[in-house]
Amino acid sequence: MSTLDEVLALLRTIAPSGDETELTADTLLFSSGLLDSLALEELHVAIEERWAPIPPMELARANFDTPAAIAATVARITHEETPVSVVRNLLSDSGRLTADLAPDAMGAGAQLLFDTWHAGGTTLSCGNGGSASTASHFAADLAKLTIVPGQRRMRTLCLNDNASAFSAWTNDEGFPVVYREQAEPWLEPTATLVAFSVHGGSRGGEVSANLPAVARLAKERGAAVVAVTGFDGGALGDLADVHINIPHATEPVATPLIESLHVLVHHALCVAHAP
């Protein structure tokens, strides 16, 4: 029996009686509400009894949110997983997810960018953390790679590039409004907002609340919204006119893997308009 099969069997003993949910490797356990915090504590105890003590660094909930993630955690704490196997699995997942990318969604996103350029509008971008660097990189590439001599250039603006404005709005009004307020003068019906986010922001509004906030303003103004996300897309994916999603949810590799593929997506959006 594989470690994953053992984990699935263990989870079936922890799941509430009467729950007929079919558990798979990527079933969301805690973020979906399928299991609660008491079940998480019970899971920790069961893992330590069955396998080995869990180091503090492994106790982040993200490491236990899917059966596959739990199996990966068990492999690490029992030393079944080596650096080489981690890299090999990361590259394998990267190839599979790249092959599964939806070209139609990326084509639709590229068309919105063309429509914005044709109408003389501005393409705005934003993100948090690593996704902020992707948003900045995207704005630079979209402005430079698409230059055609004699033609009007694409107008781009990355909302997380102005550190002074970012800190001023955060300090004075709060983090949730930091992009909305900067985008306010630019969001017209001719504009497109491209937002990058690994999780897409929580639907409850607590995590990455600045992204759904600026997306809602864009929708109110008649601007288009392109969301480039991972996991299930979150609140940002729900608001998007075009949603480009990397449906991976197994930490600790999910976040870096999704961020890497987001760079591929942003390059595809830019190359679609390259001369």
Curated annotation (Swiss-Prot):
GO BP term (any one): antibiotic biosynthetic process
Top-level taxon: Bacteria
Gene Ontology MF: a single term: carbohydrate derivative binding
Keyword set, alphabetical order: Antibiotic biosynthesis, Phosphopantetheine, Phosphoprotein
Gene field: lmbN
Pfam families: SIS_2
Residues where O-(pantetheine 4'-phosphoryl)serine is found: S37
Residues of the SIS domain: 113-275
Domain (Carrier) ranges: 1-78
Organism whose genome encodes this protein: Streptomyces lincolnensis
Protein known as: Lincomycin biosynthesis protein LmbN
Pathway: Antibiotic biosynthesis; lincomycin biosynthesis
